[in-house]
Amino acid sequence: GALNKMLSLNNKEKDSGVVAMSAGNHSQGVAYSAKLMGIKSTIVMPDNTPFAKIRKTTDLGAEVIIHGNTLIEAEAFVDSLVETRNLTKIHPYNDTQIISGQGTLVLEMLEKHKDLDFLLVPVGGGGLIAGTSIMAKHLNKNIKVIGVQTELYPSLHNIFNKGKNKCQGTTLAEGIAVQNIGSIPLSIIKNNV
């Protein structure tokens, strides 16, 4: 997803550098893609981000800033960096280029296992499940795509079941500890999952 988005940037956006927020793998995807393309990257990570992910992201050449207790707080800081440093924001899930790139995962899966009936996909902000569901349904309309969330962050479950469970707390699955599903992936998820 991150590489697909980075490849879509124009020269001005590349020259200004990129910024993203993530407590998960998106941070490393952006840092890796930026390094490949020679683009300066800044990643904002919430306080609860595991040290291993912080270290891996810095090892890939990104400037890492730890800010906020949640992804929402990290995103607010990213938005301020977009303004003050003139950086290009690479959103982890609410972006069509990110979603399209994440769908390529299904190509790899079906190449090795052509007869898959189900895909169990982790759900944070919804980008991964949106992208994989588009590609899966395109290749096999009968494949079932099932979203998996932590009990502490049931944002998609709440949408489908009119639930009112709060999204909060500490989980080992911090990469999918997202309080709100993105509006772009949600419209896709409602049709495919």
For each predicted feature, which ranges?
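PLP-dependent amino-acid enzyme catalytic core
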Residues: 1-193
